[in-house]
């Protein structure tokens, strides 16, 4: 049995400049009536920040056990795939052949149940989420439970949002959990001073008997693999339906379902709401550059803005900021 203190990181990456990948994606787009709001080009856009993700991990979280780097097959030309802590995983290594190729991040992430050597405790990153300051294992897990924020938040339908998918998640959560019992059993985990002003959300939603949704901070999520397996066994059909979708679809689920399950089960330890922050890249990335410079938050998400007029200019500014923060190569980079 693996040491329960081991914590793995999982990060997914796609290279939208890979000619073969782009060709396959284009061919399947012609076959499927895809939802453009869930599959816009910005959702695949590669900014060239990945090497700084590894530099940040090596500097700020050297205690990590293994890093599972999941891709369609391609790897950055600077990456040393023989690094002892790095496990390069191709989609074909853990996703059933019948579901490949896939251009759906939900398929890639929900199939983590089939990643055999993954530790019981792991943190799931997207390639736009970065460690921004020194972190400890206890920032992600405590007493073998994931750290998280138990904050309720009603779903608000918006254009180009994940709301339909999140609604599917919540339908399953309400099927298995009672809000009344959740609060009776774990009141202090949902009404916790660490949530600051967000406590008002939980107070305001007290009159509603059903779970209307959870607050999503868009930062890396701490997971127990056993929770993935538990939900998979109970809701196999919706997992399988999701796996069949080559592109994101409004009828599927995403990994937040497992997060909501952990929260609803009380299988988490409250974490300060200011642990991380989500930023959206815009034509003026000054706020992100300042965050990289001063490290107010330990974890940040740098979300691709869908209306950037000067992509190359903004990209250069961002890379310059990353280079100033992490000027030294990591051991994950080729010599």
Swiss-Prot record:
Protein name, as recorded: Capsular polysaccharide phosphotransferase WcwK
Superkingdom of origin: Bacteria
The EC number(s) this enzyme carries: 2.7.-.-
Molecular functions (GO terms): transferase activity, transferring phosphorus-containing groups
EC category: transferase
Organism lineage: Bacteria, Bacillati, Bacillota, Bacilli, Lactobacillales
Keywords: Exopolysaccharide synthesis, Transferase
InterPro entries: Stealth, Stealth_CR2, Stealth_CR4
Other information: Stealth proteins are part of a protein family that is conserved from bacteria to higher eukaryotes. Family members were first identified in microbes as proteins that help pathogens to elude the host innate immune system. Microbial stealth proteins are involved in the biosynthesis of exopolysaccharides. Stealth proteins are predicted to function as hexose-1-phosphoryltransferases.
């Amino acid at each position: 049995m693996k040491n329960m203190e081991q914590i793995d990181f999982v990060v997914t990456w796609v290279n939208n400049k890979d000619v073969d990948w782009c060709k396959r994606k284009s061919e399947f787009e012609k076959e499927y009536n895809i939802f453009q709001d869930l599959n816009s080009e910005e959702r695949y856009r590669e900014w060239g920040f990945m090497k700084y993700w590894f530099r940040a991990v090596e500097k700020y979280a050297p205690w990590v056990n293994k890093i599972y780097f999941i891709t369609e097959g391609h790897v950055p030309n600077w990456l040393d795939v023989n690094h002892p802590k790095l496990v390069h995983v191709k989609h074909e290594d853990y996703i059933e052949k019948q579901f490949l190729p896939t251009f759906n991040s939900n398929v890639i992430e929900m199939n983590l149940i089939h990643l055999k050597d993954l530790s019981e405790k792991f943190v799931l990153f997207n390639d736009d989420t970065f460690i921004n300051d020194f972190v400890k294992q206890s920032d992600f897990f405590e007493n073998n439970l994931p750290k998280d924020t138990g904050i309720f938040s009603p779903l608000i339908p918006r254009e180009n949002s994940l709301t339909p998918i999140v609604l599917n998640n919540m339908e399953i959560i309400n099927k298995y959990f009672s809000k009344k019992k959740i609060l009776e059993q774990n009141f202090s985990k949902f009404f916790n001073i660490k949530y600051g002003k967000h406590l008002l959300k939980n107070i305001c939603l007290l009159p509603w008997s059903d779970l209307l949704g959870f607050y999503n901070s868009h930062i890396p999520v701490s997971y127990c693999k056993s929770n993935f397996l538990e939900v998979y066994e109970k809701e196999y059909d919706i997992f399988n339906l999701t796996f069949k979708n080559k592109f994101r679809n409004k009828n599927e689920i995403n990994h937040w379902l497992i997060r909501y399950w952990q929260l609803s089960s009380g299988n988490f330890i409250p974490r300060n709401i200011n642990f991380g922050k989500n930023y959206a890249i815009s034509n003026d990335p000054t706020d992100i550059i300042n965050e990289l410079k001063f490290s107010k938050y330990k974890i940040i998400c740098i979300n691709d803005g869908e209306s950037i007029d000067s992509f190359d200019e903004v990209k250069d500014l961002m890379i310059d900021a990353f280079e100033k923060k992490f000027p030294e190569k990591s051991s994950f980079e080729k010599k």
